Regions:
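Charge-dense, helix-prone N-terminal extensions
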Residues: 1-154
Length: 154
């Protein structure tokens, strides 16, 4: 394992086994689907997020997987501009939308898979045609919310 992979595994290990397993499988499936994408890791205050984009800049991220204490979400960074005939995308902001994943297999649901394809096609900056993306640890917040649910998290 490379140093960034070891560091990411440590971040993920702080979540419950169910969340860690789901999120890890989602990351693996997306990395296999778009191997040319750079994977940018942000271990932030509210969540652990891994963005998939064409380069090392956060502003060009197309998709992002976020680990929360009780769920894993797939974010579409330009989701407001996507066609959503099934109404699966959540969010009301001017740009970003997301879908909560209950299991990694949700990526295979036609409505989610189609949304991923659409996001990749409509990306402001497309992914490289070939190559192998890197895993980059971009930010680790000193202060973080608990990564496992507790009685005070509702």
């Amino acid at each position: 394992m490379s140093a960034p992979e070891t560091q990411l595994a440590g971040f993920i290990a702080r979540f419950t086994p169910d969340i860690a397993a789901c999120g890890t499988e989602v990351l693996a499936r997306l990395a296999a689907r778009i191997p040319e994408a750079e994977r940018l890791v942000y271990d932030n205050y509210n969540a652990l997020a891994v963005g998939f984009g064409p380069d090392e800049r956060a502003s060009t991220v197309i998709l992002s997987v976020a680990f929360y204490p009780r769920w894993v979400s797939l974010f579409f960074m330009q989701g407001a501009g996507l066609d959503d005939p099934h109404g699966i995308l959540k969010g009301q902001g001017s740009t970003v939308r997301h879908v909560v994943l209950t299991q990694a297999g949700d990526l295979d649901r036609p409505e989610i898979s189609t949304m991923i394809d659409q996001a990749l096609v409509k990306a402001k900056k497309p992914l490289p045609v070939d190559g192998q993306g890197r895993l980059l640890i971009k930010s680790v917040s000193a202060r973080q919310r608990p990564r496992r649910p507790g009685p005070d998290i509702g």
